[in-house]
């Protein structure tokens, strides 16, 4: 039985690509036709590649391997956080900081700083400080939580990355390639399938499409870890249209630690 049916893919709008003038010719093998100036993705291939991705991720999860979810676009951010949390994965859903993986040693020090601030907050130690000093530390903690909260429990580099929009997450792709970390990615018709290990041709702009694909890949991780899916998982698949209005993307700068920003983090301004 396939992981996802053609009917589910159609219903979620997975087949809608970009306008024909915005395509990447390397995606031609995954394009079924063109309609009203928009490319239509071949859902038969999408379903087949979903099976391949699901089996790969489930097997890797059975072996104890860990996955990082990456999706910083507004439509994907909320889904990435919820699905990664649900299956026990890690996630980056705000801005990708330069060196997130290739400079993991430095990033890890910022994660430890976040944990320390959270411990001090939980123990009420911050309440004992002067109000101004406590306020500064709480602002620092909030910013660290925003950008690094999804990898707070990640003790080492991930064994694989699940990504939404390879084109947007170009810096993440480069770092994965340098470290030989496998990438499973949703690819719209403007993406490059040669940059990832398992491509999943799909609409990476529609919330329902992202939810369906990312949700199934999260299922694979959960099944690999626990042997079966929870009975109430079907109830979990709510309509994610609410994220389009309610979820706010990342804003502001990346001054995570003004004291040593230059040596610890690079501002990634890669935008679509």
Curated annotation (Swiss-Prot):
Keywords: Ribonucleoprotein, Ribosomal protein. GO terms for molecular function: structural constituent of ribosome. Pfam families: Ribosomal_S2 (PF00318). Residues 244-272 are annotated as: Disordered. One of its GO terms (biological process) is translation. The keyword Membrane does not apply. It comes from the Bacteria. The keyword Ribonucleoprotein applies. One of its GO terms (cellular component) is cytosolic small ribosomal subunit. SUPFAM superfamilies: Ribosomal protein S2. Belongs to the universal ribosomal protein uS2 family. This is Small ribosomal subunit protein uS2. The gene is rpsB.
């Amino acid at each position: 039985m396939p992981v996802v049916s053609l009917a589910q893919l159609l219903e979620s709008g997975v087949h809608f690509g970009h306008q024909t003038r915005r395509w990447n010719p390397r995606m031609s093998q995954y394009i079924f036709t063109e309609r009203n100036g928009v490319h239509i993705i071949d859902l038969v291939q999408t379903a087949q590649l979903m099976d391949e991705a699901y089996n790969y991720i489930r097997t890797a999860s059975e072996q104890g391997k860990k996955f990082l979810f990456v999706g910083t676009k507004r439509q994907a951010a909320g889904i990435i956080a919820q699905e990664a949390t649900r299956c026990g994965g890690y996630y980056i859903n705000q801005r990708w900081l330069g060196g997130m993986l290739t400079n993991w040693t430095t990033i890890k020090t910022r994660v430890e700083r976040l944990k320390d601030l959270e411990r001090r907050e939980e123990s009420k130690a911050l309440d004992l400080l002067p109000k101004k000093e406590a306020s500064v530390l709480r602002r620092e903690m909030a910013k660290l939580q925003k950008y690094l909260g999804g990898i707070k429990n990640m003790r080492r580099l991930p064994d694989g990355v699940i990504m939404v929009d390879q084109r947007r997450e170009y810096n993440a792709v480069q770092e994965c390639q340098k470290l030989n970390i496998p990438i499973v990615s949703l690819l719209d018709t403007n993406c490059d399938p040669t940059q990832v290990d398992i491509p999943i041709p799909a609409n990476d702009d529609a919330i329902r499409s992202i939810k369906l694909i990312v949700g199934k890949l999260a299922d694979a991780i959960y099944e690999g870890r626990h042997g079966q899916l929870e009975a109430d998982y079907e109830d979990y698949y709510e309509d994610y249209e609410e994220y389009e209005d309610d979820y706010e993307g990342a804003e502001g700068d990346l001054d995570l630690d003004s004291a040593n920003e230059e040596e610890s983090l690079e501002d990634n301004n890669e935008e679509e």
